[in-house]
C-alpha cells in the first residue's frame, strides 16, 4: 500500500521511466506530441499565437517555436560553443575540477577535431587520465556562459566577476523573447549548455535559482531529437510528452516557468543532415549529440 501511495505521489517519475529505454531504441511514441507532425498525439492543444509561435494549452505559459533557429545559425552557434567558448578558462565545464584541461588552440575539442583524439589528458588528484576522444564523446556534459552558476551553493556569484555573455547567442535569444513574449527588456545573462548522448537523461526539476521566477527561460535544441516532459508544480500530476527537434525553441513563462520538466530520452539517429559537414570528427560528434542552450536572465532589470 505504501509503495502504491508513493507511485501515486510521483506520477512524473513513472512517465520518466516509461520513455527511458535502451540508448539505441525508440520508446512507444503514441502519446508524444510532435509539434512538426499535425497527425501526432494531442496536436490540437497547440495554438498558433504568432507566426511559428505556439502556446500549449496543457502547460499554460509554455511557448513552442517550431524550426525557429535557421540551419545556418545552428551551425554558427554550435561552432562557437565548441571552437571558442569551451576553450575559454572563464567558462566552467563539468570537467574543470577533475582534469588538467589544455585551453586556447590546444583545447580538447581542437585536439579531437584535428585528429588527435588518442592523446591523453591527465586527471587532477585521484581522477584517472582519459583520452581526448572519451572526454569529448562521453564526459563533457555542460559548460556555463555569462554569469557562472555555482553548482555547490546553487547561486549566481557577483556578476561583475563573470565573463561577458556571447554576443551571437545573446542577440538571437533576446530577439526571440521580444518577438514572442511581452518581456521586451529581457536580457540574456547566463546560460547552461548541456551535451546529451543517446542513453543520457535529465531528471525532473524546477529551475529556481534566479531572483525573479516570472522571467522566462529559453531553451534552444540542436542535434538529436529528444522527448521533453512538462508537468506542473507537483510531481503527482501526469506530465505531457513532446518531441523536440533541432532548431526548435521552448520558452517557459507563466505557470510553466515553475513547472517540473525533464528529458527522459534522446532519440538516436535523428540529427538533421544539414548539420553534417563531411568532416569525420564533426559528423561523428554531432550525429551522436543533442546540444541544448538553456538561457536565462538572472536578476530583475534595474
From Swiss-Prot:
GO terms for cellular component: cytoplasm; cytosol; nucleus. Residues 187-299 form the Fe2OG dioxygenase domain. It is found in: Cytoplasm; Nucleus. Its EC number is 1.14.11.-. Disulfide bonds: none annotated. Substrate binds at residues 142, 149-151, 235. The keyword Cell membrane does not apply. InterPro entries: Alkb (IPR004574), AlkB-like (IPR027450), AlkB-like_sf (IPR037151), Oxoglu/Fe-dep_dioxygenase_dom (IPR005123). GO terms for biological process: DNA repair; regulation of translational initiation by tRNA modification. It is an enzyme of class 1 (oxidoreductase). Gene3D superfamilies: Alpha-ketoglutarate-dependent dioxygenase AlkB-like. Binds 1 Fe(2+) ion per subunit. Its cofactor is Fe(2+). Disruption phenotype: No sensitivity to methyl methanesulfonate (MMS). One of its GO terms (molecular function) is metal ion binding. 2-oxoglutarate binds at residues 194-196, 290-296. Keywords: Cytoplasm, Dioxygenase, Iron, Metal-binding, Nucleus, Oxidoreductase, Translation regulation. Fe cation binds at residues 205, 207, 261. It catalyses: an N(1)-methyladenosine in tRNA + 2-oxoglutarate + O2 = an adenosine in tRNA + formaldehyde + succinate + CO2; N(1)-methyladenosine(58) in tRNA + 2-oxoglutarate + O2 = adenosine(58) in tRNA + formaldehyde + succinate + CO2. Dioxygenase that acts as on nucleic acids, such as DNA and tRNA. Requires molecular oxygen, alpha-ketoglutarate and iron. Mainly acts as a tRNA demethylase by removing N(1)-methyladenine from various tRNAs, with a preference for N(1)-methyladenine at position 58 (m1A58) present on a stem loop structure of tRNAs. Acts as a regulator of translation initiation and elongation. Does not appear to possess DNA repair activity; no activity towards methylated DNA or etheno adducts. Belongs to the alkB family. NCBIfam families: alkb. This is tRNA demethylase abh1. It comes from Schizosaccharomyces pombe (strain 972 / ATCC 24843) (Fission yeast).
